[in-house]
Design a protein with these regions (language model features):
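Histidine/acidic residue-rich metal-binding segments in metalloenzymes
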Residues: 1-61, 70-89
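Short, glycine/acidic-enriched loop or turn micro-motifs at the edges of active sites
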Residues: 9, 46, 97, 174, ...
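Short, acidic/turn-prone active-site loops that include or flank metal/cofactor-
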Residues: 9, 66-70, 94-97
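Short, function-defining helix-loop hinge/capping sites that tune catalysis or transport
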Residues: 14-17, 51, 102, 115, ...
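His/Asp/Glu-enriched, well-ordered alpha-helical/loop segment
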Residues: 31-38, 80-176
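Glycine-rich nucleotide phosphate-binding loop and flanking beta-alpha elements
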Residues: 48, 70, 97, 112, ...
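Short, charged, surface-exposed secondary-structure boundary motifs
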Residues: 71-76, 100-102, 185
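C-terminal cap of metal-dependent C-N hydrolases
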Residues: 169-192
Length: 192
């Protein structure tokens, strides 16, 4: 059985943990043996670099819920830093209290857009010491598809699903893309 909770989503949450336990939520979980490859947390928006490293070393996963985080204004998890540190990344919809749709297709699209916007916010012009243009390379369509499929299977411990290959279990969804809302679609894998 996998362990799951919501963690490090808002500044108020961090302040409350620091006040009550004199540590961050991730540090609290580490102290109570609640990290590991059988644990995954929703959100993980507010993390220190050493927490990202700890989550990676322990193989603790994340369910990124971009629409919920956007609706609540809590921020956007740095999925690329998490993934580079070894954190298994997946996508989630959070719950009805903060996501009206629970639609994984629009969640994947939001993850793609918001990861790019997050990195773009860090871009500076060259005269100010900037070294990159923006966030266009922050998340690819392939990243988002991986997070929404293989990443989800990994954090749930579903070794026989998550990819389309011989011998694996799979469910397929087919969408019509001839609706006017798809006319500007550049990549069918990331359509809203």
């Amino acid at each position: 059985i996998r362990l799951h909770s919501h963690l490090s989503e808002t500044v108020d949450y961090l302040d409350a943990a620091r006040q009550k336990f004199a540590m961050t939520p991730v540090q609290f979980c580490a102290e109570h043996d609640w990290l590991g490859n059988d644990v995954w947390f929703a959100h993980l928006v507010k993390l220190l670099p050493e927490e990202i490293a700890l989550l990676g070393r322990t193989g603790t996963g994340i369910a990124h819920c971009p629409q919920s985080n956007g609706r609540l204004g809590s921020g956007i998890a740095d999925l690329l830093a998490l993934e580079q540190a070894g954190v298994p990344v997946s996508l989630g919809v959070d719950g009805a209290a903060s996501n009206e749709a629970a639609d994984m297709q629009s969640e994947a699209h939001a993850a793609w857009l918001l990861q790019r916007a997050r990195k773009g916010m860090l871009a500076q012009p060259r005269y100010a010491g900037g070294t990159f243009e923006g966030g266009a390379d922050a998340a690819t369509v392939e990243d988002v598809v991986r997070w929404g499929s293989a990443g989800g299977a990994q954090i749930l411990g579903l070794a026989q699903s998550g990819t389309l290959q011989v011998g694996m279990q799979a469910d397929l969804a087919i969408y019509r893309l001839d609706d006017p809302r798809y006319f500007g679609l550049h990549d069918m894998a990331i359509g809203p």
